[in-house]
């Protein structure tokens, strides 16, 4: 059995793409980034931690909003440059108050349709 860090290929900034997916439904929830420290914390605690590029630091999912992701399984793709984070996400995953960050669909003609409305007011999640 290999060590996970032997197969993950981090980019020049020490980050790897992480796709969060609801473990029991297959719903794609969000895309984020992880560094080694975020992966180590996630594996150690079972609570998903990402790396925030805008804040340049660890982002413990749900720390502010209460919308915690619990790790079910961590998978590495064939090239080692992307992670699939299978999670249990009871509430919303998106900062817009939606279940998934992928709530817009683009038609072949380029028009964009909003598929879902917010389930929670973002101000309720994060304050004003």
From Swiss-Prot:
UniProt function note: Catalyzes the hydrolysis of the adenine ring of phosphoribosyl-AMP.
Assembly notes: Homodimer.
EC number: 3.5.4.19
Similarity comment: Belongs to the PRA-CH family.
One Gene Ontology term, aspect cellular component: cytoplasm
Protein's name in the database: Phosphoribosyl-AMP cyclohydrolase
Biological process annotations from GO: L-histidine biosynthetic process
Reactions the enzyme catalyzes: 1-(5-phospho-beta-D-ribosyl)-5'-AMP + H2O = 1-(5-phospho-beta-D-ribosyl)-5-[(5-phospho-beta-D-ribosylamino)methylideneamino]imidazole-4-carboxamide
Organism in which the protein naturally occurs: Granulibacter bethesdensis (strain ATCC BAA-1260 / CGDNIH1)
Principal cellular location given in the protein's record: cytoplasm
